[in-house]
Amino acid sequence: MSPQTETKASVGFKAGVKDYKLTYHTPDYETKDTDILAAFRVTPQPGVPPEEAGAAVAAESSTGTWTTVWTDGLTSLDRYKGRCYHIEPVAGEESQFIAYVAYPLDLFEEGSVTNMFTSIVGNVFGFKALRALRLEDLRIPPAYSKTFQGPPHGIQVERDKLNKYGRPLLGCTIKPKLGLSAKNYGRAVYECLRGGLDFTKDDENVNSQPFMRWRDRFLFCAEAIYKAQAETGEIKGHYLNATAGTCEEMMKRAVFARELGVPIVMHDYLTGGFTANTSLAHYCRDNGLLLHIHRAMHAVIDRQKNHGIHFRVLAKALRMSGGDHIHAGTVVGKLEGEREITLGFVDLLRDDYIEKDRSRGIYFTQDWVSLPGVLPVASGGIHVWHMPALTEIFGDDSVLQFGGGTLGHPWGNAPGAVANRVALEACVQARNEGRDLAREGNEIIREAAKWSPELAAACEVWKEIKFEFPAMDTL
């Protein structure tokens, strides 16, 4: 008998295919504090029992494969396998279930979102036994989150760097997003910043195209920042998009931004990838740069209710990988975002400890053990009439970003910035005086417009603009 045959015989190997649930469905399992916990929305194919579907998810995202293999006997599956430990039906859905899976921490490389996602949201999402699969939430244990640097700086450090307290920060995406020359682009940045905004932003599409190469844009934007700072006495910034075709080129752009002395750079973290994002976040902490994160491509992943990854998971992953700001929807603007769900993942971005709350889509209690927080960015189809609602919904620790709502002002960019700053200051003052922004918001804006012709003009332009469509992402 060969040594190989002896090994197979000694572990009782029996070739063939057996149900996943025999090994991976463990309803008696008590989860450990060190386990990564996942909540999957599972839609099995007709005839596939929920227990088998949930067990298949646990198996295919951890140690399992479609058939028994003799090398199972060379390791301890009980130590390394994922376990489907609970299954519950989804209210109002006949064939959907929430499958809870526990993964032992040894399955994952320390400090690597890339490795974590490769397992948990890898090949299993194409598994034929499932009609659809969506990752609704993850519980990241402190033992794992402590292996990540997280955001380069966090909310408090950013406020200290900018010397700005007690209100949301104001931003603006430069439009048109594509086609401007570098000098005209810099001019638009200057006008917005001198009008009262804290930040301006490269659109996520802006990298280094023939009409505007990145180095030229960086230089003219830096000039605009320094000129606006000198005139206003406030610290200003522009999100210089360092996203590039290679990690090496991305880092070269970040290094040049640091050499210019600007306060912040930007990255498209989903199209750029988690490995690139984590590398950039480490550089930003080491070199004093803030990092703004755009979520381009997120709706491809998170918008379908039955399949994909919920944005709360992508938000948690970003907090681990690293970013000081991230776009998070508006609730009231043109982009997707239901209020309670949005506030749920906003808290997951900002707060240190978040209790389980299914009414807001939070499946697990999350303890970040002092990992720095991320400022949520509200952006997309918002204007001055939205300011009371945005201030009330997002609170002080946020960035309110008006692109068309600044540059679309009939008098130009600087008056558009003035209108937004006046509206924000009026809302913050009214809130601090105890007024109800949700109920009195329009009146607060009208009162402020009496003393600000720029705000009055903005109110007139956008008085009828609404984006009233039902949210796709509901509980």
From Swiss-Prot:
Domain of life: Eukaryota
Modified residues (N6,N6,N6-trimethyllysine): 14
Gene Ontology molecular function: magnesium ion binding; monooxygenase activity; ribulose-bisphosphate carboxylase activity
Main localisation: plastid
Propeptide residue intervals: 1-2
Subcellular location: Plastid, Chloroplast
Transmembrane feature ranges: none
Positions contributing to substrate binding: 123, 173, 177, 295, 327, 379
A biological-process GO annotation: reductive pentose-phosphate cycle
Keywords recorded for this protein, A-Z: Acetylation, Calvin cycle, Carbon dioxide fixation, Chloroplast, Disulfide bond, Lyase, Magnesium, Metal-binding, Methylation, Monooxygenase, Oxidoreductase, Photorespiration, Photosynthesis, Plastid
PANTHER family: RIBULOSE BISPHOSPHATE CARBOXYLASE, RIBULOSE BISPHOSPHATE CARBOXYLASE LARGE CHAIN
Subunit annotation: Heterohexadecamer of 8 large chains and 8 small chains; disulfide-linked. The disulfide link is formed within the large subunit homodimers.
Family named by the database record: Belongs to the RuBisCO large chain family. Type I subfamily.
Purpose of the protein: RuBisCO catalyzes two reactions: the carboxylation of D-ribulose 1,5-bisphosphate, the primary event in carbon dioxide fixation, as well as the oxidative fragmentation of the pentose substrate in the photorespiration process. Both reactions occur simultaneously and in competition at the same active site.
Name of the protein: Ribulose bisphosphate carboxylase large chain
Species in which this protein is naturally found: Alnus incana (White alder)
Phylogenetic lineage: Eukaryota, Viridiplantae, Streptophyta, Embryophyta, Tracheophyta
